[in-house]
Every structure is written in structure tokens, then in C-alpha cells.
A protein has these predicted regions:
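Electron-transfer interface patches adjacent to heme c in soluble/periplasmic c-type cytochromes
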Residues: 18-28, 85-189
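Post-cleavage N-terminal segment of exported redox proteins
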Residues: 1-53, 167-172, 193-201
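Short, solvent-exposed loop/turn and secondary-structure capping segments
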Residues: 30-38, 74-76, 81-86, 140-141
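The canonical Cys-X-X-Cys-His
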Residues: 60, 66-75, 125, 192-196
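Electrostatic cytochrome c docking/interface patches
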Residues: 41-65, 77-84, 109, 179-182
Length: 201
């Protein structure tokens, strides 16, 4: 034991050697953290039926993120019996390949939304967003009444699609060119409802 301590003592007394050994250990730890991410990025393919968001749903996802919905709602069903019985099959990475930023979340004040699409009607979703306590008296969710009058900007949606295409999402020129027409006359409320209704489908 005393012999082993001499090596530690020698390293501790030599600041240059200690610094080099620290850099080596940090580099090894960094490789252990980063390498799987680089491999996984190429290995995770979209699940069957998973496509990039259309223009209206993409605008809705942006509203969802901007309004901080992810702070109270997750979109990740864990592989626990209680969760799969309540929400359905557990979430897998291939369902979220087009989510930037990802929406898995880390906290639930409200229910998980990964499979909410189609569970309620569009009218229910609209009312719930405008006046949550009208449909769920015990809800502590805030009302989002301003979304009903906020019009979407088709040029912003098209620019977002171009950016996502640069990041690897398979948007075509016709998708991008048609974005303005797809959201013409639509509100942020319409977009958020469309986004929610598509989750899990």
C-alpha cells in the first residue's frame, strides 16, 4: 500500500503531470459520452409511419415549445406497467426523430401527451386550450386565449422548414413552397390543435 501511495504523491506534487493525466481522463470520459451519440444519430431511423411535420403541425409544435407546454407535459411513455396501461405502448427514439428540440420532457404536472392524438375531438382540444376548467374543473393549466387571434405567418413556417431540411429532415421544395398556402388564414390555436391531434399517430 505504501508503494502505491508514492505514485499518487509523485503525481500530486508534479502539477504538469497531474494536468496531463486529468486531460487524458476527461478526453476518455468525453469519448465514452459522445461516441454513442454519433453512432446513434445514424442508427435511429424513423418508425414506420413517422414523417416530418406538415406546415400546420410544425407551426403548432413551435407554439407548444414557445408557450412552455413541455414544462408540464412530457411526451415520453416510460416502459413501466402503470404507464403503458394508462397511456399505451412505451415511447421509442424512432418516434421522435423529427423533434427538434425533442419533447420527451422530465416532469409531469399534466398528463403525458405522446399518444393524445385523436383521443379527444378538435372542439374539445380548442375549448381545453381556451378555458381548461370548462372541461376539467380540477385543472391548473393556464388558459391560452390569445392563440385564437394570433395569425400564422407562412413565410416563417417556410423558413423553419428550410432550416430543418438543412438539419436532415426530408422536406421537399414543394413542401416548403406550399407552406404559406397551408397555413393561410390559420391561427396559432389551429396549429396547436393540429399538432396535438397528430401526436402518437
Amino acid at each position: 500500500m505504501a508503494g502505491g501511495y508514492k505514485y499518487f504523491e509523485a503525481v500530486e506534487k508534479n502539477a504538469g503531470l497531474l494536468g496531463i493525466l486529468i486531460l487524458i481522463m476527461v478526453a476518455m470520459g468525453g469519448l465514452a459520452e459522445i461516441t454513442p451519440l454519433l453512432i446513434q444519430a445514424h442508427a435511429v431511423k424513423p418508425a414506420p409511419g413517422v414523417k416530418p411535420y406538415d406546415a400546420l403541425r410544425l407551426a403548432g409544435k413551435d407554439v407548444y415549445v414557445r408557450e412552455g407546454c413541455y414544462l408540464c407535459h412530457s411526451q415520453m411513455i416510460r416502459a413501466l406497467r402503470a404507464e403503458t396501461q394508462r397511456y399505451g405502448a412505451h415511447s421509442v427514439a424512432s418516434e421522435s426523430v423529427y423533434d427538434r428540440p425533442f419533447q420527451w420532457g422530465s416532469k409531469r404536472t399534466g398528463p403525458d401527451l405522446a399518444r393524445i392524438g385523436g383521443k379527444y375531438s378538435d372542439a374539445w382540444q380548442r375549448l381545453h386550450l381556451l378555458d381548461p376548467r370548462a372541461v376539467m374543473p380540477e385543472s391548473n393549466m393556464p388558459a391560452y386565449r390569445w392563440l385564437e387571434s394570433a395569425k400564422l405567418d407562412g413565410n416563417d413556417v417556410a423558413a423553419r422548414m428550410r432550416t430543418l431540411r438543412t438539419l436532415g429532415d426530408p422536406y421537399t421544395d414543394s413542401d416548403i413552397d406550399g407552406a404559406a398556402k397551408a397555413v393561410a388564414g390559420k391561427t396559432e390555436l389551429d396549429a396547436l390543435v393540429a399538432y396535438l391531434q397528430g401526436l402518437g399517430k
